């Protein structure tokens, strides 16, 4: 037992006395041997913290950049707000050469006020207002049914569309009114002679209606109506020429009558105004 204990004690004393192999050296070795995993752990942890810190730094830099952009935008807005915003007004040369614009003691507010007054008295602005008023009056007058120009345009279009008919405009209205009954009769009868085109009121030299002429006088053109067909049959060239001359005379008389009516309506309008 003593022999077994003595070597342990001797070994322990020798280990304590030997420099570099004592418990201190053993502790240092253990600490050095235990140091690398700790260091490795710290290095790993340091790498993670470094990545996190880099992420935080990038976010912070982005925030700084955004804040700088916002601040620069606010600064630009403040500069624009401080600078006076004057409205551009186009003035004539004679207005710009006026003496009150060249006065050296005028402030910006006074110049702006003078420019607004000059805009009111500008010729282009007045022309635009006059043109707008004129267009408004024209539109308002064209909507009225009794306007002379509108009535004349309707009459001229009606004459241009119905020149081949040997009758006046008021007779076309009768034909339109009787067109429904004539269409119904055309279904039963294959051919039917239109009676409205074969009679015409007689006019004397003064253009006054005296009565109705006979049917033999107006037989220059015969208009037959068939289902889905409308054609004209000429009787003789002499009769057609006489009818054309008569139609021209009637048109001239009607135009003179319309001109006299327009003059009378203008006089009544002037009296009312």
From Swiss-Prot:
Name of protein: Protein FAM216A
Pfam families from the UniProt entry: FAM216B (PF15107)
Stated family: Belongs to the FAM216 family.
Domain of life: Eukaryota
Organism listed in the record: Homo sapiens
Region of interest: Disordered: 1-47
